Amino acid sequence: MPKKIFLLLFSLSIGIAAHAQSLYSDSVYNKYLDFNLARLQGEQDKVLELGEALLPFADKLPEKARINFYFSVGKMYEDNDEHSKALPFYEKVALATPNYYVVHRALGYLYLEKAKGIESQLGASTASDTTINHQLTLAYTEAVRKALPHLEKAQACDPSDETLAIIKTLYKNIKDDQGLNTLDSRLKELGKNCVDILDDK
């Protein structure tokens, strides 16, 4: 008899815990919906507040909703000129949905911005600063190499003369003739699988 009572109590506690978990997940999803509504209505201050409040609980969202949320948070930070905060969220989205070219465009241009900052420092340094110039050249090349794959995916899926010109210029700047010469074949291959809208259901 005590064994049956124990099993009954154990089953009840599992049921209550499962119900509480379900309510908790529903609450997180409702906060996600509130965040999206604020975004759609252009309430920037509210978007930032709701987005940052939801971040610690994002892992409770369904996978597709979580990926969509991360993209929206990246966009939120990018629009707020907090690019270093946007990058990790965009990177998560690119990792989860590698064919979603919109996130690649965002990443490509954010990394390009970093490369341009380094390029400006290079232009401002004197020729006698060989050590500094060497370090800046390495940093510039690294930033360009981060930007290029993202810009190429965006170009392959949504061609733009401006993006193509930037890609070609970057290859010339880092003196990568092989990368430049094989660009067309890479773009053709990258263009085979393109996603332009994230589904959150």
Predicted regions and their residues:
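N-terminal leader/linker segments that initiate helical-solenoid repeat arrays
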Residues: 19-57, 64
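Structural register within alpha-helical repeat arrays
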Residues: 34, 73, 107, 114, ...
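Short coil/turn linking the two alpha-helices of tandem helical-hairpin repeats
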Residues: 40, 62, 75-81, 108, ...
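TPR alpha-solenoid repeat register
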Residues: 69, 103, 163-164
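Short coil turns that delineate tetratricopeptide repeat
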Residues: 97-98, 157-159, 192
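Short coil/linker segments at helix-helix boundaries
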Residues: 113-153
